[in-house]
Amino acid sequence: MGTLQSWRRAYGALKDTTKVGLVRVNSDYAELDVAIVKATNHVECPPKDRHLRKIFLATSAIRPRADVAYCIHALSRRLHKTRNWTVALKALLVIHRLLRDGDPTFREELLNFSQKGRIMQISNFKDDSSPVAWDCSGWVRTYALFLEERLECFRVLKYDIEAERLPKVSPGQEKGYSKTRDLDGEKLLEQLPALQQLLHRLIGCKPEGAAKHNHIIQYALSLVLKESFKVYCAINEGIINLVEKFFEMPRHEAIKALEIYKRAGLQAGNLSAFYEVCKGLELARNFQFPVLREPPQSFLTTMEEYMRDAPQMVDVTSGPLLLTYTPDDGLTSEDVGPSHEEHETSSPSDSAVVPSEETQLSSQSPPSVETPQNFIDTDDLLGLHDDTPDPLAILDQNALALALVSNDVDSSPFSFGQARDLDPSGWELALVTTPSNDISAATERQLAGGLDTLTLNSLYDDGALRAAQQPAYGVPASNPFEVQDLFAFSDSVSPPSAVNNPFGLYEPTYHQQEQQPQLQVAPSPANPFGDFGEFPIVPVSEPQSTTSFGAFPVPVSEPSNTTGFGEIPVVPVTEPPNTTAFGEFPVVPVSEPQNITGFGALPVTPASEPSNTTGFGEFPVVSVSAPQNTTGFGALPVIPVSEPSKTTGLGEFPVVPVSEPQNTTGFGEFPVNAGAHEQHNSNNPFGSTGFL
């Protein structure tokens, strides 16, 4: 067992040394962190004063509040991360010493920090390293609850019990008294429960088991005993003050005072038992324990008898009470006031509250005053001086309840209240018209049942609105997700292009011509490299094409196209001409579309198998039964019988299809006769081999 304890002490010392080295390197408050680690090390002894003085200096009023807050945060982190009861108890001891002997700035910052979370809430703390540690862990938890309640008591009392200096009652009396002796009844009922709860936590710090004989626990218990004397003194002085004010309190306050008095008697007995336990410890040599006496039972019985006869709480207003005077009733100023039935049957003018001087003047006036027939009081248009009318009277006089209105209209004179109920537009008309005492015009406008023209028109308008809002049968329901057109208010005005086409702003300046099922003549797009001239398209029945070598008529049924280099007839069948960025090169696709490259227009017309070209030039190959092949030394075109003529970008080479087609090149004409077996001709690059 001794070896295990020695190993644990060595391990704790190693952890403390490592922690000190780490905080010296990594912490911005190295000196404060080192003092906190050394004051809360694993050694079972009270914190040393030299380490406490450094912590007191860091939390003094001359230091910034940020340093005080960092100290509280470091102590809280040290308390909640440890699993050793010695480190936890020494951290609580440092906090207790700062609350007792430290600057008030620390208490204020600790209150602000406790609002975010309880710093000393360690109800789950437990050290299972040994049976002694088990008992000590229980006392550490009760000690933390006492410190937490001490902080809460400071929040209620607004002052610290331990820091309170007890004044002398008189020069010849040595015993002082607490602030609770001079409190009024309301504050006394607020502060005494907080002090009694603090005393309850203090009595709970009674050590048990192995914790009674631990040296560091007895050191912390001595601090608790010192505070118990002042806490009990404050409660005792408050009870004396409470007893003096008890017989002057109303019933609800007397009930609270009686509960406080009963709890004080019970706590006196518990505190005496706590002192008896402490007297058996070594620390009892430094303390002189007071003798506590419980309150007499006879006085408690007297207080309970007073509670049965105590008056109820009555709220009496300080202002003068105004009574309503009615001439018909023989009430005097000593009566309480008119009954509820008389209050309901009285007229609005009689129920108005008037001062006492006007009451005396009204007693001398006649008991009733005749109200003119056509008189309306315009001073009270909203009826603020009138009481709430009877619902049955409103139902009988309601002009909108047509089913309840009789046909017989009473033409007798009516008072102002009746005119107001029958005319639903009373105060609205009075706001827009000149005040007048004559209501004959309004009476003439009224119809049967008390209705007037304005009310009747409003009923018709309301009926038309309800009919318009009713759903029509057979009409498809509207789509709730359909977005309404912003320009639907006018069909004659077309909306701007930005609404119809939101992408119109981002379209390029040139547009590609769409393919049409019929032959169309479209304007040529602009050439970015310059315009070589106009290229008219003239449809003829049999156009003739010419070159620099001669005229070569080509009978076609479609119009010919020309370019800036010469006339190159191209017969479009179904597809429009295509252009590139280097110029206009019309290509007429027969069954397959033409392909173009970046070096120029190389039209390829597939018959059964399309022609092939190379990078040295254009070599169209037209296959009849077996297609012709060309070489890189010259173009050997073979034109089938039923196929149109082909052109290139180097010049115009018309080919006239006959029963036996002829082939030409740029150096001359080379006729080729096609029979059962097709002949292949080749050109001599140094001259022509035959002429027609």
UniProtKB/Swiss-Prot annotation:
Residues 24-161 form the ENTH domain. CDD domains: ANTH_N. InterPro entries: ANTH_dom, ANTH_dom_sf, ANTH_N_plant, AP180-like, ENTH, ENTH_VHS. Expressed in the whole plant. One of its GO terms (biological process) is clathrin coat assembly. The keyword Repeat applies. Residues 325-383 are annotated as: Disordered. GO terms for cellular component: clathrin-coated pit; clathrin-coated vesicle; extracellular region; Golgi apparatus. Residues 532-666 are annotated as: 8 X 17 AA approximate tandem repeats. This is Putative clathrin assembly protein At1g14910.
